[in-house]
A protein has these predicted regions:
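Short, conserved phosphate-binding/catalytic loop or strand-edge motifs used
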Residues: 110
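Short, glycine/polar-rich helix-capping loops at beta-to-alpha or helix-loop-helix junctions
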Residues: 123-128
């Protein structure tokens, strides 16, 4: 095995995070523009006229750049979306990450490769076979266990399931970062309680609050010892990353476009080192050091997700970050 057998994709939610991802050893980065992405309100979101410069930086570093256009789209937004696709094609974006079929088809019309978002919740070989006619890479559902992932990977190889470029479909999975209470991130809680749709990049993170339990028949309200009943811990797979490679995952995606550059740099570096260690046979000896470093940046505590067979999520016991190192804001850098 070689490190080049796998792709490590890091979040670039800002200029600083883009630099951190490149310096940390990412093979690719993903970013959003304006309101048509799942982090529409991230502080450092890019504009369409940033795309040529962003892609120039990526190409100079030998890194692929993926544009996320992965929200639910309405008719009044289609012209804006198509203009964005045209701008992305002119900037020679490496691929578009999409879930709404309007975005998938628009990307194909301007010659852009498509990666299928986790929002599609692709969970089996038949679904992957159907979507393969539109894409070359698919992010599988976060709720799959590794045996299910291996089954899909075997089908990709044996059938085979080919993408639009004529090559076997690449299987992408999230390897680190925040997890949503909703199925593969498709959640309506924020919409129904606050009028802001998580499926359109507006999530207000209601699930991160504490809640009480109410008996509707008797009107009794119970304050739970741990009220964070809807808030999952963060995903961390570095302890079993070798099992993910063995299951057939070829693209490893780090969540965190709303997180800071220190998070991006640390997490990207650790997972790059882990993939290199798997390739050269030194993986086991280094796990503890990665765990310690990952704990220093923003996290809500860690669990393995559903990959190892868990049936229910592990929830947090406090609000905000559990990082072992606390940061103090000292000022804003305005020029460099």
């Amino acid at each position: 095995m070689r490190r080049s057998d796998w792709e490590l994709m890091a979040p670039a939610g800002s200029e600083e995070a883009l630099s951190a991802a490149i310096e940390g050893g990412a093979d690719s980065v993903y970013f959003g523009v304006g309101r048509l992405n799942m982090r529409a309100h991230a502080a450092g979101n890019f504009r369409a006229d940033d795309l040529p410069r962003v892609m120039d930086r990526c190409r100079a570093a030998g890194v692929k750049g993926y544009l996320t256009v992965n929200t639910v789209l309405y008719d009044e937004e289609l012209a804006e979306m198509k203009d964005l696709m045209t701008a992305a094609a002119k900037a020679r974006v490496s691929a578009v990450i999409a879930s709404d079929m309007a975005a998938v088809l628009a990307a194909r019309e301007v010659g852009l490769p498509v990666h299928l978002s986790t929002q599609l919740n692709i969970s089996n070989t038949e679904a992957l076979t159907f979507y393969a006619q539109y894409a070359e890479t698919a992010v599988l559902a976060r709720e799959l266990n590794l045996n299910q992932v291996r089954c899909i990977a075997d089908a990709v190889r044996d059938k085979p399931i080919l993408g639009t470029g004529g090559e076997a479909m690449r299987l992408e999975m999230f390897c680190h970062g925040a997890l949503c209470m909703g199925m593969s991130g498709r959640c309506w809680m924020s919409l129904h309680t606050r009028g802001k749709s998580a499926n359109r990049g507006e999530c207000l993170q209601n699930c991160r609050r504490t809640y009480n339990l109410v008996d509707r028949e008797r009107g009794t309200e119970l304050a739970l010892e741990n009220g964070y009943v809807l808030s999952p811990k963060d995903l961390k797979t570095i302890d079993f990353l070798d099992k993910m490679t063995a299951a057939g995952v070829t693209v490893f995606k780090i969540e965190g476009r709303a997180r800071g550059a220190d998070y991006v740099r640390t997490v990207t570096t650790c997972y790059d080192e882990a993939l290199k260690a798997i390739a050269d046979g030194t993986y086991d000896a280094k796990r503890r050091a990665w765990d310690d470093r990952l704990a220093t940046v923003f996290n809500r505590g860690f669990w393995a997700g559903y990959y190892l067979g868990a049936e229910t999520a592990e929830i947090v016991h406090s609000y905000g970050s559990c990082a072992t190192e606390k940061k103090v804001f000292v000022g804003r850098l305005v020029n460099y």
